[in-house]
Amino acid sequence: MAATPYQTGFIAWKSSKGEFKEWELNGTRLAPDGQLVIDPSAAAFETDPMPFMEGGISFYNGGAFRVGEAISPVITSPFPLDELVPSWNADTPTGAWLEVGLRVRVGERWTGWYNLGVWAADTTTISRHSVSDQTDADASVSTDTLILQSNSDTQAFQMRLRLFSADGVQTPAVRMASVAFSSPRPITPELKPGNPRYWNKHILVQECSQMIYPDGGNVWCSPTSLAMVFGYWGWNAGREERVRTSVAGVYDHIYQGHGNWSFNAAYAGARGFDAYVLRVTSLAELEPWIAADVPVVVSFGWREGQLSGAAIPSSNGHLAVLVGFDSAGNPIINDPAAPSDDGVCRTYDRREWETLFLSRAGGTVYIIHKPGWLPAA
């Protein structure tokens, strides 16, 4: 029997297209530009349920706040769901933050809401964090990903955004929300041929090594990849400033790391980019982005001996930047695990790398670009 093909889906709502009008609003409203904000006249008054958590942080702000919520329409997947990863782009001024939830319909029954993160762009008011210890008979949360226990009868979901204001005046302003969803990751993925007309192209993205920073750089692959992309799109700060600022901007105080996919996309969004987590079924799906001059942050993992020319012997989960394809279609990747900046750009064998990209990370990428910059059809 042939293996079931890997399937992925994506849904997004953008304020620029008026798409939050589809959401159910309770204590929130739409600003004139379509962004989702708190409605001070209708928001509830609440206090932090866990002001003293392990590690010296609070679940929210440690005190009182106003909160409203917005719930998406029911989204039906064309295939049984296995994993879901949310993204959002929002401004969160000091005194404002947001919380992201997902729930899934199992048969005719809805699960409870799973918490996929409490977010603000800085730590003046809250300590941004994922939420651990969320496992039940229906699903579990692994930092940034909702994982279903069984995908046999789960083909619908909803997203919830809760918006918070410490003073009832400052408000988050959400301009985009999205969910990437997928079927079970393929153990032995079916590799699809690419299109040679997209090959033999290399986007020049300044190389940045994570390994030159002795104070934690060995685990900074994701923010270092962001730093490379930010430099490409015009942030003219030096390499180290871009890296260290990104490291601070994506840190998850519960996960105690920098690899939260959703937080990385949210941080890029906070810097003014269109940014979201996407899952694809093949490397070929990324070729049009390279053709459109959009470098793509890619996730993959490998055991020792699985990736020829790898910058380090192995990794359970790693992020790097796809910057092009050589004349044979092999991916050209700025790999921050290189020991120095000048060794970051590498070309990996397409079959080897794509297999690891799909089987170990489910084809997960960050799409980050200037607003409105899209590949040609």
Residue ranges and their predicted role:
Residues 10-59, 63, 76-79, 95, ...:
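Noncatalytic regulatory segments and standalone regulatory/sensor domains
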Residues 96, 221, 318:
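Histidine-centered active-site/metal-ligand motif
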Residues 62-63, 72, 240-376:
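Conserved active-site-adjacent core of cysteine acyl-enzyme catalytic domains
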Residues 12, 162-258, 310, 327:
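Active-site-adjacent structural segments surrounding the nucleophilic cysteine of cysteine proteases
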